[in-house]
Amino acid sequence: MFWADQLANQAVVRVEKDFAEGKINEKCAVIRCGQTPSGGKHIGNLNDVIRAYFVYKSIKEKIENREWDGKVKFIHTSDDRDPLKDIPIKIMDLNWKWHESKDLGLEKFLGMPLCRVPDPFGSCSSWSQHFTKVWVEGIKMLGIEDMEIYYNDDLYKEGKFDLYIKAIFEKREKVSEIVKKFQETKHENYIPFDAICPNCGRLANIDDLNNNTVKFKCGGKEIKKKKTEGCGYKGEVKISEGKLQWRYEWPAQWGIFNTTFEPFGKDHFEGSWKSGQVIAREIYNIEPPIPFVYEFFLVNGEKMSASKGNVYVTQDVLKILEPEVLLYFYTKKPEKQRDLTLAEIFRLVDEFDNVEKIYYGAENGRTEHETEDAKRMYEICINKKFSAIPKRLPYVFASTLSQIYGEKAIEKVRETNKKAGQILYDDDLAKIRLEKAGNWANLYIPEGERIKIIDDKEAQKIYLGLDNKIKELLNKFAEMGVENLSGKEITLKIGELIKSSGDKELSVKFYGACYMLLFGKEKGPKLAGFIDTLDKDFIINRFKAE
């Protein structure tokens, strides 16, 4: 069974049990995820959202198919009261363009809640609003529309956290025990709550709770092993003008939303998750959600980091991939670390195209189990179901056509369909694939390695240096009228041509000669498919002796 379906089943069982025991008022599975809008959130952060989305989608299917009579919600929280801990090297504007941050004077906002830091581009009310907008727009581009978005800043103002804040003061001794067990570097009287200083706007450690207010002195605090400067202000603020520290805020969110299921990365498993379970049960009197730990993945062999600047957000990757292909990447087993190598992204696309063929019965997996898995993986990542198998242009071929023909590439695809006398490639899908594969070539193929047709003068020099047997085959090939044939027919003609020569070893030399005459390289795209896009005069001039 697909991993998301297994988790969906667990969530349904949990809801049924909680409802029967009177712990919840309605049978509703709450699938939750969240992010801190600290900058451009990369595709590794998408793990939270997409893993949760697949489980949500599986439960939704159960409801639509009348397999369960409950409800399901998909909730995302923006942890916008988290402090600005460091300045990302690059930040993205609302037009999805990256900018250097070094000259923007943002250091003065370190230690302030993200919801109180100004938007560096002046387009939104705050830093957090800006980067949450960029993040959510990327998610919607994937076809994920059902997500309810909540902001911690609003939840604090509305008093949603009050019950949990008061609980940590009422159970100070128990909190101290938990601190000793999980946070050895903290002192015995440590209180996991910070006030927002009304004078300088930074988060500051507090002294005590007095009814619904907290006393504090703004002496700064340590963030990521760095001390932020406080202004020295002494006073009181309402508890709604503060923030639970992460280990205590996360379990409080579980309680606020009655969270049934939540995925998280392995970094939280060893720390926050283990302490969070204790805090949930012993401080807040709630049960933690069903957990799901996923492994991080690398991009180009490296871990992404906003502070280092090697970040790829959803919008970046959707320049080179269709949304369904990117979603497919997240269907793979989450406990295994994977490396998304952008220079070889065609491998992922080819894999998706093959899974699509398996879904529509045009191909089979190596085993029955693999076939069933492939069908389910495809089904859960596709947002639009087709009435028949989509006829997609192969990615590498699309890249080749885009590099050589540019905007006229779609015309070559249409000519190919016309020659074949049938629709080999769907027009709308071909336009999208040509755009994505063309962007990929421009962004990730070094200029010297991109494909282009060499000029006649260079081709003539290469032709003169060829073996006479190869020249003879090329002359015959040029006279075969292949310009009127489909790619499949051209492949057959080449096979017949080599066979008629009586020397099978000429096959490699023939293909190599064709690539050299076309591109000045011994390798290239599938030859027959590309020749199918060429006109008669070009073929004769390039392959036939004058």
Regions found by a protein language model. Give the residues of each.
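Catalytic adenosine-cofactor/nucleotide-binding cores of aminoacyl-tRNA synthetases and other
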Residues: H268, W273, I283, E295-N442, ...
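Short, solvent-exposed loop/turn and secondary-structure capping segments
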Residues: I43, K85-I87, K180, D207-L209, ...
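A short glycine/serine-rich beta->alpha loop
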Residues: Q35-I43, T259-G265, I498-G502
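Short, conserved helix/loop micro-motifs enriched in His/Cys and acidic residues
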Residues: R32-G39, P251-N258, L492
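A generic secondary-structure signal for well-formed alpha-helical elements
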Residues: Y56-I59, I63, I139-D146, R172-V179, ...
